[in-house]
C-alpha cells in the first residue's frame, strides 16, 4: 500500500515537463488521473482539447496505468458502472448530430439560387408592354377622287390636349384647347407631288368631327342627361349605331314622366275607400290629379261593379288603361321602357361647330395650305376621348367653274383621328393651354381663335386669363 502511495513522487517527476507554470498537490494530480481514467469516452467530447492534452501527459507512468486498470475493472464489477454506461450512449449521438446541422445549412444557399432562377418578375414587364401596345394610332383613310385623280389626306398639325367639361347646359361653353388645326394634303396621283393650293378652289371642302373613345374603337357621340330634380347627369356615352330606329329609345322622350305613367293606373278609379260606387267616374272620363293622389291596386274596383263590362271599351284611354284583365301589349312595352330606363334624353356629347369649312391660310413658315380650324368644340362629360375628322367634297366631281352642290351622296375621301385628350371636371381642371404660335398666326389672318395676350402688366390680359380658367 505504501508503494501505491509513492506514485505521487512519480507524478511530481512527470508534471515537471507538463506543468511548467503550476504544480498541483500530489493528491489533486492523482484525482485528475482517476477522473481521466474513469470516464474516458464520456468526458472526451465536452472538455476542450487543451485539457485533454494536459490530462493525457500524466498517464504514461506504468503504476498509474495498472492502478487505473484495476480501478476500471473494479468499476465494471461494481454496480455504479451500469449507471455510467447508461450515461455514455447519449453523448456520442450528440457528437454525431452536431455535424449534421452543419451540413443542413448547405442546402439553404441552394433555394436562394432557385429563387433567383425563376424570372417571373422579368416576365412582368411584358404585360406592361402589352398595355402599351393598345396605344396604337387608329388607321387613317386616304382615297383618290374619281374624275380628278387627286389623292386627299388629313394631317392634324395641332392636337387637342385638354378641356373642361361644359355639362348639360347651353350657356357655359368650354372649348377644347388648343383648338385642333387640320391640314388637307392633296397630291396628284400622276405626278406624286402636291398641287398648288393657290390655284385650287376649296369652297366645297367640308370637314366633319365625331367623338370617339380614347382607343378609337367606337364612337361616343351620345350621352344620356337626367332632367329629374336633384338628380345628377349620367355620364354614360352611347353611339348612334347602338340606337336602332326600331327601338323605342327616341319615342320614350314623348312619354309622360313617371308621375303621369303611374297616374293612368287610376283611370278605373279603384279607390273604394275614398269614393262610393255611385260617385265613381266612367271609363272614358279622365280623373283629376287630386283623385289620384293615393295609388292603390286597380283590381279592387272591378269586382265591385258588376254592371260594367270587364273588357275595356275602345276609347282614347284604352292604351293607357291598366287592369288585371285586358291590357294593351303596346302600352305594356312602353311602360316597361319607362320603368326600366331612367328619365332623361339622349343628347350630343360633343357640341359646337361640328363641321368646318376650309380656309387657305399660311402657316408659321408662311407656306400656303388648305386648313380646317375647329375652335368651337366642347365636351359635356369628363373622360378621355379622341376626335375623328372626315373630309368630304360636297361639290361636283371635277371641280369645274360652274360650282354646283352635290345633291346625292358624297364619299368620304379622307379621315384621321386625333391624339387622345382629357376632359376634366371643374375641380380637377388644370387650366387652359397657352396659345400656340400656329393659333396666333391664324388669328392674325382673320380666324376667330381665342388668344391669351402675353402681358405682365395687370389689365386685359389677366382678365382674359381669369375668364378662360373660370
From Swiss-Prot:
Record keywords, A-Z = Cytoplasm, Nucleus, Sporulation, Transcription, Transcription regulation
Q: Where is the composition biased (Basic residues)?
A: 74-86
Annotated ranges, domain Velvet: 147-452
Q: Report the locations given in the UniProt record.
A: Nucleus; Cytoplasm
Q: What is this protein called?
A: Velvet complex subunit B
Q: Which organism is it from?
A: Gibberella zeae (strain ATCC MYA-4620 / CBS 123657 / FGSC 9075 / NRRL 31084 / PH-1)
The protein's matches in Pfam families, at most eight in alphabetical order, are given as:
Velvet
List the GO terms this entry assigns under cellular component, sorted alphabetically: cytoplasm; nucleus
User: Low complexity bias located where?
Assistant: 15-37, 232-241, 280-301
Q: Where is this region: Disordered?
A: 1-148, 223-321
What role does it play?
A: Component of the velvet transcription factor complex that controls sexual/asexual developmental ratio in response to light, promoting sexual development in the darkness while stimulating asexual sporulation under illumination. The velvet complex acts as a global regulator for secondary metabolite gene expression. Component of the velB-VosA heterodimeric complex that plays a dual role in activating genes associated with spore maturation and repressing certain development-associated genes.
Q: Compositionally biased, Pro residues: which spans?
A: 38-49, 102-124
Q: Which protein family is it in? A: Belongs to the velvet family. VelB subfamily.
Amino acid at each position: 500500500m505504501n508503494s501505491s502511495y509513492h506514485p505521487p513522487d512519480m507524478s511530481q517527476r512527470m508534471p515537471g515537463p507538463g506543468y511548467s507554470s503550476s504544480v498541483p498537490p500530489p493528491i489533486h494530480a492523482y484525482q485528475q488521473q482517476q477522473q481521466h481514467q474513469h470516464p474516458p469516452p464520456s468526458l472526451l467530447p465536452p472538455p476542450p482539447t487543451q485539457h485533454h492534452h494536459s490530462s493525457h501527459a500524466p498517464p504514461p507512468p506504468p503504476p498509474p496505468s495498472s492502478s487505473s486498470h484495476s480501478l476500471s475493472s473494479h468499476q465494471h464489477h461494481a454496480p455504479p458502472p451500469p449507471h455510467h454506461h447508461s450515461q455514455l450512449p447519449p453523448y456520442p449521438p450528440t457528437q454525431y448530430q452536431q455535424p449534421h446541422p452543419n451540413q443542413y445549412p448547405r442546402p439553404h444557399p441552394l433555394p436562394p439560387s432557385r429563387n433567383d432562377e425563376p424570372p417571373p418578375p422579368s416576365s412582368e414587364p411584358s404585360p406592361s408592354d402589352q398595355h402599351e401596345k393598345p396605344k396604337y394610332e387608329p388607321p387613317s383613310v386616304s382615297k383618290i377622287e374619281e374624275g380628278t385623280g387627286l389623292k386627299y389626306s388629313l394631317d392634324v398639325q395641332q392636337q387637342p390636349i385638354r378641356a373642361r367639361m361644359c355639362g348639360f347646359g347651353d350657356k357655359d361653353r368650354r372649348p377644347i384647347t388648343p383648338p385642333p388645326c387640320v391640314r388637307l394634303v392633296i397630291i396628284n396621283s400622276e405626278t406624286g407631288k402636291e398641287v398648288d393650293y393657290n390655284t385650287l378652289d376649296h369652297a366645297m371642302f367640308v370637314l366633319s368631327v365625331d367623338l370617339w373613345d380614347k382607343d378609337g374603337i367606337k364612337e361616343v357621340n351620345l350621352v344620356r342627361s337626367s332632367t329629374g330634380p336633384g338628380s345628377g347627369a349620367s355620364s354614360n356615352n352611347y353611339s348612334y349605331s347602338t340606337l336602332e330606329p326600331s327601338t323605342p329609345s327616341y319615342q320614350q322622350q314623348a312619354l309622360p314622366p313617371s308621375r303621369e305613367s303611374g297616374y293612368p293606373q287610376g283611370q278605373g278609379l279603384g279607390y273604394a275607400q275614398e269614393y262610393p260606387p255611385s260617385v265613381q267616374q266612367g271609363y272614358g272620363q279622365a280623373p283629376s290629379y287630386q283623385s289620384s293622389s293615393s295609388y292603390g291596386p286597380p283590381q279592387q274596383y272591378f269586382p265591385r261593379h258588376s254592371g260594367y263590362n270587364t273588357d275595356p271599351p275602345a276609347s282614347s284611354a284604352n292604351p293607357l288603361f291598366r287592369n288585371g284583365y285586358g291590357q294593351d301589349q303596346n302600352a305594356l312595352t312602353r311602360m316597361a321602357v319607362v320603368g326600366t330606363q331612367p328619365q332623361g334624353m339622349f343628347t350630343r356629347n360633343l357640341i359646337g361647330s361640328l363641321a368646318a369649312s376650309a380656309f387657305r391660310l399660311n402657316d408659321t413658315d408662311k407656306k400656303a395650305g388648305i386648313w380646317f380650324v375647329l375652335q368651337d368644340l366642347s365636351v359635356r362629360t369628363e373622360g378621355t376621348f379622341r376626335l375623328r375628322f372626315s373630309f368630304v367634297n360636297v361639290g361636283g366631281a371635277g371641280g369645274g367653274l360652274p360650282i354646283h352642290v352635290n345633291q346625292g351622296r358624297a364619299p368620304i375621301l379622307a379621315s384621321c383621328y386625333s391624339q387622345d385628350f382629357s376632359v376634366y371636371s371643374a375641380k380637377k381642371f388644370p387650366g387652359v393651354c397657352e396659345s400656340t404660335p400656329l393659333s396666333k398666326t391664324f388669328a392674325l389672318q382673320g380666324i376667330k381663335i381665342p388668344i391669351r395676350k402675353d402681358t405682365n402688366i395687370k389689365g386685359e390680359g389677366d382678365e382674359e386669363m381669369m375668364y378662360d380658367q373660370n
